[in-house]
From Swiss-Prot:
Keyword field: Cell wall, Cell wall biogenesis/degradation, Disulfide bond, Membrane, Secreted, Signal
PANTHER family named among the record's database cross-references: EXPANSIN-A15
Signal sequence region: 1-30
GO cellular component, one term: membrane
Membrane topology: Peripheral membrane protein
Function: Causes loosening and extension of plant cell walls by disrupting non-covalent bonding between cellulose microfibrils and matrix glucans. No enzymatic activity has been found.
Membrane found in the keyword field: yes
GO terms classed as biological process: plant-type cell wall loosening; root hair elongation
Name the record gives this protein: Expansin-A7
Localization terms from the record: Secreted, Cell wall; Membrane
Length: 262
């Protein structure tokens, strides 16, 4: 009887700890680990200022304001994965090219789509045509790996954990009956599979994937403080960001949480 009682007490204690962390918005099931090395090619777009890399198909807007800066890349269709690749982080190193800077690597965040160009052969200009895996990097990121005049370089790459400062950020768009959320600064695997929103007077409401890193809910939520449930696309882990936005939230504003993946 003694061992059974001890086991029950431990499970009860663990359940209480789980609930406390989930309510605080700080619970994380584990750490995302680096993936295997693979091979691809990389090019660059824009100039040294990164002006042409702002915005993009993930919806992050001004990449300096959203925290990504110039360490970014547009992904080929295969890697972009209908927007579920947004926010993922990749370690990239130049491989087997005379233009490589020896021993150099850099980490970039996926912020854009490199669309296919079916007017050009996949091996002669149509670098982002499926099923190719390709990175069209911001020029400053590319220049960490190789001389820019190389144009295109063979690379080795792998998924790595996204190291983020602070919690996830939720940019609000929409109106009183349609809520559109862009999620930024996501740690861990960096990506999102699904989301739900909870008003202070509602149960959890599932949100649908709109485009890029945005999710939407068709519901009247104005006048309620809002919390979010976020599930990672890669790991399936779920965390809760409680009371992210106050009852007087408005579109065009970005609200910060304390919750994040690792």
């Amino acid at each position: 009887m003694g061992p059974i009682s001890s086991s029950w007490s431990f499970n009860k204690f663990f359940s209480i700890v789980f609930v406390v962390f989930a309510i605080s918005g700080e619970f994380v099931a584990g750490y995302y680990r680096p993936g295997p090395w693979r091979y691809a090619h990389a090019t660059f777009y824009g100039d040294e200022t990164g002006g042409e890399t702002m915005g993009g198909a993930c919806g992050y807007g001004n990449l300096f304001n959203s925290g990504y800066g110039l360490s970014t890349a547009a992904l080929s269709t295969t890697l972009f994965n209908d927007g579920y690749g947004c926010g993922q982080c990749f370690q990239i190193t130049c491989s087997k090219s005379p233009h490589c800077y020896s021993g150099k690597s850099t980490v970039v965040t996926a912020t854009n789509l490199c669309p296919p160009n079916w007017y050009q052969d996949s091996n002669a200009g149509g670098w982002c045509n499926p099923p190719r895996t390709h990175f069209d990097m911001a020029k400053p990121a590319f220049m960490k790996l190789a001389y820019w005049r190389a144009g295109i370089i063979p690379v080795a790459y792998r998924r790595v954990p996204c190291q983020r400062s602070g919690g996830m950020r939720f940019q609000f768009q929409g109106n009183s009956y349609w809520l559109l959320i862009f999620v930024m600064n996501v740690g861990g695997a960096g990506d999102i599979k699904s989301m739900a929103v909870k008003g202070s007077r509602t149960n959890w409401i599932s949100m649908s994937h709109n485009w890029g890193a945005s999710y939407q809910a068709f519901s009247s939520l104005y006048g309620q403080s809002l919390s979010f449930r976020v599930t990672s696309y890669t790991t399936g882990e779920t965390i809760y960001a409680w009371n992210v936005a106050p009852a007087n939230w408005s579109g065009g504003k970005t609200y910060k949480s304390t919750a994040n993946f690792r």
